[in-house]
Swiss-Prot record:
UniProt keyword list: Acetylation, Chromosome, Cytoplasm, DNA-binding, Metal-binding, Nucleus, Receptor, Transcription, Transcription regulation, Zinc, Zinc-finger
Zinc finger feature spans (NR C4-type): 103-123, 139-163
Source organism: Rattus norvegicus (Rat)
UniProt protein name: Steroid hormone receptor ERR2
Residue numbers marked as site, Important for stabilizing DNA-binding: Y185
Ranges for domain NR LBD: 208-432
Subcellular location: Nucleus; Cytoplasm; Chromosome
Gene (name only): Esrrb
Role played: Transcription factor that binds a canonical ESRRB recognition (ERRE) sequence 5'TCAAGGTCA-3' localized on promoter and enhancer of targets genes regulating their expression or their transcription activity. Plays a role, in a LIF independent manner, in maintainance of self-renewal and pluripotency of embryonic and trophoblast stem cells through different signaling pathways including FGF signaling pathway and Wnt signaling pathways. Involved in morula development (2-16 cells embryos) by acting as a regulator at the 8-cell stage.
UniProt family annotation: Belongs to the nuclear hormone receptor family. NR3 subfamily.
Length: 433
């Protein structure tokens, strides 16, 4: 196989929990991935998009001067043609690949539409069993348990709440427990034909989530855990090395995540690249911000890698710490929910300030689609706050400013040459400067 066809097959004030390290990725295309889940084994953005492989600290595959004649873009297109030439080669990180239908409850592969929602057999059976048995559950925690394929059995209460939240219909379950063909749903009677019915049935307090929000929720990557190098003594080098590795691994997931945004794969390959190259740091910082919401004046760079002000000062990250903390406080004040967080990530990507957009009309359509989805969500879930969508959108300029500070800081770290950087992170830095 030619190189062009290659593809993706922390001390003071911080603490490291003894958690398992973050998996490299669930995608088969990461077969050439390094064990740590970083991007150096096959090259950075080039690995994801099919470019020539290089090791750590080698010259970047592209500069930030534009996309014309960009070898990264050429390899991106090679990736799309290679999948047509050889069906055995799966370019899983090709951004215009069509994602499989996922269960909106747990993220497993959906077997079809059950009770009005794309869902897997396990969640379908769980919902049916709960309704037929009239079972009531209670959450031992705070009714906010994460429901994934691996953890869907850990909390039945939160799993059932998730079923209802994504739109599963109770009336779709046969209460007589009789097996048979599909149940026929009759159209609801008009109120004038059945005034009694209109008096007895009241609308639910909250409507099911919009499809776009549901898709974004199930597309969220697994939780991220730090992997501090054991052979580096405690200090600024170890902290920066850990953060650079975390960023590199998150970028790998980010490329996969982007193709699950409805409408994103309709853009040209060049525009997909432009948006990612422009907005990646904003998306990463949003992740840090959301993880940090439960803490007081601390930043959660990963689930198990948390820095306070003193540690940030010792490792030279005090200015960046204060900038990100400003965002954390702003989102805390807004009491941002996870549904809003995933929408903001998608909007940050679509609202990129890239100068190299080929089809502005198509990008504008994507922006309009996501803006409308946010508005619909806020109207259905937060109707008592009619200006909430606007307040959330007004946080994006501060997010962009903070991302610019982060890029400049890590680029200066790169120029010093003391901290190793994996290919993907290195190349994305080059694209932003």
């Amino acid at each position: 196989m030619s190189s062009e066809d290659r593809h993706l097959g922390s001390s003071c004030g911080s603490f490291i929990k003894t958690e398992p390290s973050s998996p490299s990725s669930g995608i088969d295309a990461l077969s050439h991935h390094s064990p740590s889940g970083s991007s150096d084994a096959s090259g950075g953005f080039g690995m994801a998009l099919g470019t020539h492989a290089n090791g750590l600290d080698s010259p970047p595959m592209f500069a930030g001067a534009g996309l014309g004649g960009n070898p990264c873009r050429k390899s991106y297109e090679d990736c799309t043609s290679g999948i047509m030439e050889d069906s055995a080669i799966k370019c899983e990180y090709m951004l215009n690949a069509i994602p499989k239908r996922l269960c909106l409850v747990c993220g497993d592969i959906a077997s079809g539409y059950h009770y009005g929602v794309a869902s897997c057999e396990a969640c379908k059976a769980f919902f049916k069993r709960t309704i037929q048995g009239n079972i009531e559950y209670s959450c031992p925690a705070t009714n906010e348990c994460e429901i994934t394929k691996r953890r869907r059995k850990s909390c039945q209460a939160c799993r059932f709440m998730k079923c209802l939240k994504v739109g599963m219909l109770k009336e779709g379950v046969r209460l007589d427990r009789v097996r048979g063909g599909r149940q026929k749903y009759k159209r609801r009677l008009d109120s004038e034909n059945s005034p009694y019915l209109s008096l007895q049935i009241s609308p639910p307090a909250k409507k099911p989530l919009t499809k776009i929000v549901s898709y974004l929720l199930v597309a969220e990557p697994d939780k991220l855990y730090a992997m501090p190098p054991d052979d580096v003594p405690e200090g600024d080098i170890k902290a920066l090395t850990t953060l650079c590795d975390l960023a590199d691994r998150e970028l790998v997931f980010l490329i996969s995540w982007a193709k699950h945004i409805p409408g994103f794969s309709n853009l040209t390959l060049g525009d997909q690249m432009s948006l990612l190259q422009s907005a990646w740091m904003e998306i990463l910082i949003l992740g840090i911000v959301y993880r940090s919401l439960p803490y007081d004046d601390k930043l959660a760079y990963a689930e198990d890698y948390i820095m306070d002000e003193e540690h940030s000062r010792l490792v030279g990250l005090l200015e960046l710490y204060r900038a990100i903390l400003q965002l954390v406080r702003r989102y805390k004040k807004l009491k941002v929910e996870k549904e809003e967080f995933v929408m903001l990530k998608a909007l940050a990507l679509a609202n990129s300030d890239s100068m190299y957009i080929e089809n502005l009309e198509a990008v504008q359509k994507l922006q309009d689609l996501l803006h409308e989805a946010l508005q619909d969500y806020e109207l259905s879930q937060r109707h008592e706050e009619p200006r909430r969508a606007g307040k959330l959108l007004l946080t994006l300029p501060l997010l962009r400013q903070t991302a610019a500070k982060a890029v400049q800081h890590f680029y200066s770290v790169k120029l010093q040459g003391k901290v190793p950087m994996h290919k993907l992170f290195l190349e994305m830095l080059e694209a932003k400067v």
